[in-house]
Amino acid sequence: MVLQHTDSTVPQAAAQAAGTVIAFGQASDMAAYGPMPRVSSIIDDCALYYIARTKAVMDGTWNSTSTWDGIGAGMVGIGEISNAVPADVKASAEALRNSLADGSYHAFTGPLNKQDGSAWLAAGETASDYGDDSLAGMN
């Protein structure tokens, strides 16, 4: 399995050439560069954000702010899940994606521990985006 965190087609093409290496793309839909065996791609789409921020500059309403959008806002997406994934697994993945998007599931829900094994989130507790011990400050 090749899962890269670079917006490059090379890992997809290399997996395609190897023939038996499954790939998962990053930043844009990589299907054309390694159609099979491929699972999907994370797709970053900041277009609506950039349009809104540009309009705010133009109409004088711009202010500095942190942005932490994801699947629900459309800033991050999951591309088409290929036939390399069994239908039942694909359906489960799509249901999970949809629950992340509508907020009914939070990916960081306890119990979760930190890398050193110490407790981070208690059972049922969800991580906050900002503040002490938040997702934005995770390292």
What are the roles of these predicted feature ranges?
Residues 1-139:
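A residue-level marker of the well-folded mature domains of exported/periplasmic proteins
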